[in-house]
Amino acid sequence: MKRKASLFFNTLVLFGVTLAGSSCSLLDNIMNQVGDAMGIRLSESKKTCVPGQKFKLKVFEEIIKGEVEEYTNYDANSWSSTNEEVATVDDRGNVVCHKVGSCDINFKSVGTKSCHVKVIEKELKSIKISRLKKKYAIGITQNELKGQIRNNSTITAVYTNNYEEAVIPQIINVSEVDTNTYGTYPVTFSYYITSNDLKESATGNIEITDASETSDKEKMERSIFDYADSSIRTTGYLINGKFKSVVIPIWFTDSDNFISEAKKDNIRNDAQKVFFSDNPSEDIGWESAKTYYEKESRVNGLLSGEKGLVDIDGKVSDWFIDTNPSSVYKDSEPESDLKQRAVDWYFSTTGENINDYDANNDGYLDGVIFMYGAPDYSTTGDSTNNLWYHVIAHSFSSRPSISTPILGNNMWVSYASMYGENNFKDRVGKNDYVKHYGKNTGLKLNPHTYIHETGHMFCLQDYYSTTRDESLPTENTMQSNNIGGHDPYSLLINNWANAYIPNESMTLDIRDVQSSHDIVLLTPKWNDAYSPFDEYIALELFAPNGLNEFDSNNGYGFGAYSEVGLRIWHIDSRLYCYDTGEITTDPRDGRTAILTDNSRGSPSGSQQIFKDHDEYPLLHLLRNDKDFSIDDTRLDMQESHYFKAGSTFSLEEFDKQFVEEGKLNNGLKLNWSVTVKNIYTNLDGSYGATLELIKSE
């Protein structure tokens, strides 16, 4: 922050003679005025709290008129409290309220900015049920029922200042529940601060049902959107909801070496279909990027009939005519010049409102795709290694602006992967590079690469290894090898699926993941934040239907598989929090980064702090092969490695496939075993499996 230091120094020089012998209050007053002129402010100027409440103060500075950004480059001793018995603050602006009273939380840089904190007595306003397991087995005793309800519900107290916290209710009334009769019954929770307080109550309904149906799906309360907001590496992501996207095709001075001038409209029309078609079975032969993510974001699966969380509205622009050959961009990222010129051209020539392309108002443009008029470097065989398919973040030298959004995560792709031997010459006009792109069996246009890259724009990583020959994730997932649907982890972190999280032994029936998005998570103890950024075993029933169907039948690339079977994943997505220096599961704890990835043995980011974590994969699809090792470099993930009827699983049985041999990476035993009792076909055409889940002490 040299600009600030310079301004601070000049201010001292300017007032040096005048301030000699002056009071500190005068100096503070002048410094405060300087701070005001520099546009420094806190996120809150006053706050009413109750004892035990925590909140974070942020510092903002106005860069230019009307545009602000968070300021984090301050000294550890910048924060202070005028009364630490009332409230304390750490060196990152995290405030904890302790007792009734008032104080100021001060931030001192150029002048002092304050937040006045008033701590009042806890006055209970109401309670609410934020999580309640709905189904319980017939024949359970009322005492057992009360104990299970207490362990499987979250009660939140709401105070007069609207602060909320999870509490343990003193009373759970199940007197109206007939545990020996099927039906739905009310359960009342009551809570008070002290015995003299008026009790506040809330009522929820539970169902007495068969033992095999006693688990409810749980929604993840944390998502990739929380992580992206807190991450030191990720910004400008796509969101759930409706957003606009644009593809800008780029014509270089040498593009006519690769595309006939007369075929330019073919490229634009085909890109419109590959990315945004509403009728992809006719236009493509599979899915467009639009329909793929709109279907995959149906929380309860493709057969649910519900609307997906993702709603994409997109178009392809005219060609942006560049004044350079494609070779200019072969060795460096083109975004600093070419991309910005293309974006400026698009909005100036179309007259569209740039703010319409920032659906979440984060100051970054949503879904900008640059389709360059050249084949990728692996096809040409030269050193043009930037002419590849990737999604890259915005330039960190740029500052986001809500009034005029800038480029966020954006896609850089060639036109050529849309085609194969069956249509390359017809659509492009030239045939020089057709062999690289295969036959596109069963497809009119090929969307696979573009769907994969769109996954990156939703903050999904590549799940293949770039450092070893091993194939930990498996060949047939979208973020691993451009195949079929996504893995359970990708669904959970985007809130595109809910999960069964049992905490006791049970028999559970699940449907195949494409039809239902049924996922089972096994863990010694699930985290309080209900965050998917944890370590656990995930179960899903794979079937060759839904988004898996096309690749199962046509063998794109490695191909998907045509048989039904249980897939068992070891997922370790714990976070490192830079603000606390600790491992956490909650991205809201501060600035975080995921500890693991699938490029094992090559530590980066937070892995450099915990060097031993570079051996822990983020996603690992387990083989049904007790002799298979996590370090095995065989790439032959086969259908025989799926868990079929009669198969069993425990960490002790498959210890070779875990770095810590029989334990999770966190050092804990899983204490769960799984038996696949049966796999069957449902009347609606979906598939099902009966799982026996046994929890040991």
Protein language model features and the residues they cover:
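Propeptide-to-catalytic entry region of secreted or membrane-anchored zinc metalloproteases
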Residues: A211-Y450, Q461-R468, I571-E697
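Short coil-to-beta strand junction motifs in C2/discoidin
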Residues: N554-L566
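Extracellular hydrolytic enzyme modules, especially secreted metalloproteases
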Residues: G373-G557
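Short, solvent-exposed loop/turn segments at the edges of secondary structure
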Residues: N94, K242, L472-T474, P532-D534, ...
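Primarily extracytoplasmic ectodomains and periplasmic/lumenal surface modules that are beta-strand-rich
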Residues: I64, E123, K242, F252-I259, ...
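Extracytoplasmic soluble-region selector
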Residues: S25-S212
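Bacterial N-terminal signal peptides that target proteins for export
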Residues: M1-L12
